[in-house]
């Protein structure tokens, strides 16, 4: 195997901005690009290899071809030919909807799908940009529905003004929303299931409001209240600092100032590198980039 690169899958959205195209140095005239799916095994939205002998193969093709060699023995035993993670960049010019994602058991029961635990890493943020994560006070499922109906659900959500480098872990069941001006990297389980709770009563280009999933979301929500929903860490020059470790992924951040060497020979898994700022080159032991 050699270091694999993938073609981005660009998604135009109602709320998309203009940061993704220049951030990725892409030659595209697309407007309102809200998401760039960097690595995806989602059906009908599969990433395509952009380099090397396997150029043109989809991620699903690669998993079928290389099996444990690509994803590791434990991952292949657990997920088979389904790639378990979805990596995105998200650029919000407007507030995204208030939403929640189901956990594995509920997603399997309702959709025959994985659940959706995820995390955010803030790449960039306009002045005053905010993220919402979790409840700021205890509410019941009945109160939740009442607040959705009377447009006050945002009053009981915890808001954070953000800056580059901020991290939030979002286990399935945690209500959340990305605010206008936020540009983030999102690491998540391979699932595109979203229960939209509140959408600020906005309308699309055809004058229609988007469907809400009030009752589906009510059963999926974890109503627990935490003191702080942010992930605290301190970056260390040229050393990995762990951000999140959960049953679905482990993430670390490198604040790089010089060339580093990483030995993954004993790791029974794949590794994904995301460059958040500046530029970098990745080479394997044979000099392949």
Stretches with model-predicted labels:
Residues 118-120, 177-201:
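A short hydrophobic beta-strand segment most commonly corresponding to one strand
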Residues 105-106, 167-177, 184, 192-193, ...:
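Histidine-centered metal-chelating micro-motifs
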Residues 146-153, 279-281:
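Short, structured beta-strand/loop micro-motifs enriched in basic residues and often containing a Trp
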Residues 1-139, 199-227, 251:
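Transition-metal
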Residues 261-262, 278-283:
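Short beta-strand segments in beta-sandwich/barrel cores
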Residues 87-88, 96, 118-121, 159-160, ...:
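His/acidic/aromatic-lined binding-pocket segments of jelly-roll/cupin-type domains
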Residues 195-270:
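C-terminal amphipathic alpha-helical segment
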Residues 157-169, 283-289:
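Short acidic-glycine-tyrosine-enriched beta hairpin
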């Amino acid at each position: 195997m050699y270091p694999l690169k993938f073609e981005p899958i660009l998604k135009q959205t109602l709320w998309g901005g203009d940061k993704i195209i220049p951030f990725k140095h892409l030659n595209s005239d697309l407007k309102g690009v809200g998401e760039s799916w960097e690595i995806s095994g989602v059906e009908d939205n599969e990433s395509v290899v952009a380099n090397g002998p396997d150029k043109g193969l989809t991620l699903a093709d690669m998993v079928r071809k290389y099996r444990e060699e690509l994803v590791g023995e434990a991952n292949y035993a657990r997920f088979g030919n389904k790639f378990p993670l979805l990596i995105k960049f998200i650029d919000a010019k407007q507030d995204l909807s208030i939403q929640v994602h189901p956990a594995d058991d509920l997603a399997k029961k309702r959709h025959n799908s994985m659940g959706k635990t995820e995390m955010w890493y803030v790449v960039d943020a306009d002045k005053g940009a905010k993220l919402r994560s979790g409840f700021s006070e205890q509410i019941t499922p009945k109160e939740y529905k009442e607040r959705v109906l009377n447009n006050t659900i945002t009053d009981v959500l915890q808001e954070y003004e953000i800056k580059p480098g901020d991290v939030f872990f979002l286990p399935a069941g945690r209500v959340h929303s990305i605010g206008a001006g936020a540009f983030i990297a999102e690491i998540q389980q391979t699932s595109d299931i979203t229960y939209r709770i509140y959408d600020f009563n906005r309308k699309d280009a055809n004058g229609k409001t988007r469907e809400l999933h009030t009752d589906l979301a009510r059963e999926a929500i974890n109503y627990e209240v935490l003191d702080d929903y942010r992930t605290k860490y301190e970056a260390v020059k040229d050393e990995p600092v762990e951000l999140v470790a959960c049953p679905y992924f482990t993430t670390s951040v490198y604040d790089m100032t010089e060339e580093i060497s990483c030995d993954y020979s004993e790791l029974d898994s794949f590794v994904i590198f995301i460059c958040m700022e500046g530029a970098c080159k990745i080479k394997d032991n044979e000099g392949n980039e």
